[in-house]
A protein has these predicted regions:
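Single conserved hydrophobic/aromatic residue that forms the stacking wall/gate
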Residues: 1-9, 13-14
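Hydrophobic beta-strand core residues of beta-sandwich domains
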Residues: 6, 17-20, 72, 124-125, ...
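Extended boundary segments
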Residues: 11, 15-45, 123-148
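Active-site microenvironments in enzyme catalytic cores
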Residues: 11, 36, 88-96
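Short Gly/Ser/Thr- and Asp/Glu-enriched loop/turn motifs at secondary-structure junctions
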Residues: 48-52, 154
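Acidic/histidine-enriched ion/cofactor-binding microenvironments in catalytic or ligand-binding pockets
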Residues: 57-89, 164-219, 226
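Conserved, well-structured core segments that form or line functional sites
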Residues: 85-91, 98, 102-178, 184-196
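Short, basic/aromatic-enriched C-terminal tail that caps enzymatic domains
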Residues: 222-235
């Protein structure tokens, strides 16, 4: 199981994501690498999603659909969200990549969003409310001048792609379910440079964008609550 959930294809994306590459190529790399290791790309055909990975560039918050006509260019930031089924279990993780030299503003957004996830991990403790974690994540984002998407959050994961609990990253301390040993869920705040307002593309019904057109960033990990804290299953 542990081997399977780490089959996320991210190292290949790190090596090959550069100006001139299409998001369709990234999809193909991840698909081929996942299958080569005996896994199944979880997003493919999930509720009608047409590709094996989500590629979200700049103002796209999440669920971007890979496209051969979408070519990465210098200064872009992209989130590659890779989910895998292996031996009947699901994993879910994503990373941000800076394409070539990006602006200091985008670079800071990517950095702070990763810090939000690291803070979230540090707050995963058995028998404490899950809202403590979400509150700490939100506080760090706001202190750096950013907003956090409210409508989309983390989720349980394991034998199903999306399970309980729902994980908000705009929450209050001492609220929500207790984190108990054996619980597994994602920490995946979507942090916007501007407003937290978002909308879903009416044509493809998947792509979520910021309402103001400013960039968004997201890192995602799957964590397992243990008796003493947590284990990061995949990043």
């Amino acid at each position: 199981y542990e081997i399977g959930v780490r089959l996320v294809g991210s190292e290949m994306c790190i090596r090959d994501s550069k100006p001139g590459v299409s998001t369709e190529e990234i999809d193909r790399w991840v698909h081929e690498e996942t299958v080569r290791h005996g896994g199944i790309p979880a997003p493919l055909n999930y509720e009608g999603f047409p590709k094996s990975v989500c590629t979200s560039v700049n103002e796209v918050v999440c669920h971007g659909i890979p496209d051969e006509e979408q070519i990465l260019k210098e200064g872009d930031i992209i989130n590659v969200d890779v989910s895998t089924i292996y031996n009947g279990y699901y994993s879910d993780s994503s990373r941000m990549f800076c394409i070539g030299k990006v602006s200091p503003e985008k670079e800071k957004l990517v950095k702070v969003t990763k810090e939000c996830v690291e803070i979230g991990i540090s707050q995963v403790k058995p028998w404490t409310p899950i809202g403590n974690m979400g509150s700490a994540v939100h506080k760090h984002a706001v202190e750096n001048g950013y907003s956090v998407v409210r409508e989309i959050g983390g989720h349980g994961v394991g034998v199903e792609f999306h399970e309980d609990p729902w994980v908000s990253f705009v929450s209050e301390e001492n609220t929500g379910v207790l984190m108990v040993p054996g619980m597994m869920f994602t920490i995946e705040p979507m942090v916007n440079m501007g407003s937290d307002e978002i909308y879903t593309d009416e044509i493809d019904e998947w792509t979520v964008r910021t309402e103001d057109g400013l960039p968004s960033a997201q890192w995602e990990v799957t964590v397992l609550v243990t008796e003493t804290g947590c284990e990061v299953i995949c990043w």
